[in-house]
Amino acid sequence: MARYRCCRSRSRSRCRRRRRKCYRRRRRCSRKRRRRVCCRRYTVMRCRRR
């Protein structure tokens, strides 16, 4: 089972509203996209409906 966590506490609220979750991946993000897309070792990606 994979666990999903949102980036920072601020993104946590956006995560639930926009259904966004963080996936564990080894991907480097640019400095500009680092704040919006990446959060440390987690990458923000859109969640698909089940």
From Swiss-Prot:
Tissue expression profile of the protein: Testis.
Alphabetic keyword roster: Chromosome, Developmental protein, Differentiation, DNA condensation, DNA-binding, Nucleosome core, Nucleus, Spermatogenesis
Where found, per UniProt?
A: Nucleus; Chromosome
What GO molecular function terms would the record report? DNA binding
One of the protein's GO biological processes = chromosome condensation
Task: Supply one GO CC term from the record.
Answer: nucleosome
Its family?
Belongs to the protamine P1 family.
Function field: Protamines substitute for histones in the chromatin of sperm during the haploid phase of spermatogenesis. They compact sperm DNA into a highly condensed, stable and inactive complex.
Put simply, this protein is called Sperm protamine P1
**Organism name:** Otonycteris hemprichii (Hemprich's long-eared bat)
What's the gene? Answer: PRM1
